[in-house]
């Protein structure tokens, strides 16, 4: 009889422990913010955001402000080389300045004549909206229209706003061993 009571108590304790751990796990999962599912249109819109980015950086229109408009009001851009981030360009004026290559006008951008191509785009839902990784291939470096270079990749955070999908942040992760990003044809007034 004593063994039967002990067995019943042990069984009850095990069932109770399982119930408590299941409840705790469920509560933890409910408390965490789950990524919302992205629609097919969301994926298309994020890809179009990246295509508009390529055009904005290649053509430097509206003195860089068309580029800046691709970011949220508090959005930012930076580069990263060997795990160290460079200047953080945040806010409309600073992002427009980044699009101009820190020059006074779009006529002087160091990458003038380069075409930026983005490939291998991976988009993943996140609690904030989506994250992405995309490789950068540059064509037309150093004034040679046939020179092509892999220039690392971008790590992005995208958010859906009233204006559509925008960059919350974009980090250009330079390719390992890449000393600097190559320049385009020599812009007017810029010494190489």
Language model features with spans:
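Bacterial N-terminal signal peptides that target proteins for export
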Residues: 2-13
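Bacterial N-terminal signal peptides
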Residues: 11-21
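Short, low-complexity N-terminal intrinsically disordered segments enriched in polar/charged residues
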Residues: 28-73
């Amino acid at each position: 009889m004593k063994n039967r009571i002990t067995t019943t108590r042990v069984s009850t304790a095990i069932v109770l422990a399982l119930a408590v751990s299941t409840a705790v796990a469920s509560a933890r999962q409910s408390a965490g913010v789950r990524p919302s599912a992205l629609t097919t249109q969301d994926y298309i819109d994020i890809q179009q955001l990246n295509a508009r980015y390529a055009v904005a950086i290649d053509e430097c229109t509206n003195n860089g402000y068309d580029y800046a408009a691709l970011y949220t009001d508090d959005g930012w851009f930076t580069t990263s080389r060997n795990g160290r981030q460079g200047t953080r360009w945040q806010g409309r004026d600073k992002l427009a300045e980044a699009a101009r290559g820190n020059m006074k006008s779009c006529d002087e951008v160091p990458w003038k004549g380069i075409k930026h191509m983005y490939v291998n785009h991976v988009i993943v839902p996140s609690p904030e909206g989506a994250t992405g990784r995309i490789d950068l291939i540059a064509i037309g470096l150093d004034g040679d229209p046939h020179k092509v270079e892999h220039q690392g990749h971008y790590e992005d955070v995208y958010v859906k706003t009233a204006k559509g999908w925008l960059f919350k942040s974009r980090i250009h992760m330079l390719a390992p061993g890449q000393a600097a990003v190559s320049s385009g044809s020599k812009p007017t007034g810029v010494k190489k």
